[in-house]
Amino acid sequence: MSQTEKIEEPVPSYLCEEPPEGTVKDHPQQQPGMISRVTGGIFSMTKGAVGATIGGVAWIGGKSFEVTKTAVTSVPSIGVGIVKGSVSAVTGSVAAVGSAVSSKVSGKKKDKSD
């Protein structure tokens, strides 16, 4: 064997750029959307709505269609809400958000002189 001959060894599959055939045949990978990129993968999707929780604050975006009497085509409308400590429910294409709102009401304070 001369020094000019090179022996090529097979490259392991994990060093190749493309995955080996058959590993992703039934489960194609989905590209991350904008919500996934913004929240770092912490998101949940329901029918007709997208929601995310960041630091205890729930972000909910609902998508619905409104049809008016004068328009024949449907006009898409997007609703977005930020709710802290809430319970959200989505049914069909209607996004509903319910929360317990605690308003800060300052009462009349008495002075020490009274």
Swiss-Prot record:
Principal cellular location given in the protein's record: membrane
Superkingdom in the source lineage: Eukaryota
Topological relation to the membrane, as annotated: Multi-pass membrane protein
Chain spans, region Disordered: 1-33
Chain ranges passing through the membrane: 40-60, 78-98
Pfam family for this entry, one: UPF0444
Key words of the record: Membrane, Transmembrane, Transmembrane helix
UniProt GO cellular component terms: membrane
Alphabetized InterPro entries for the sequence: UPF0444
Protein location: Membrane
Function: May play a role in bone development.
Entry's family note: Belongs to the TMEM263 family.
PANTHER family xref list: PTHR31443
UniProt name for this protein: Transmembrane protein 263-A
Taxonomic source organism: Xenopus laevis (African clawed frog)
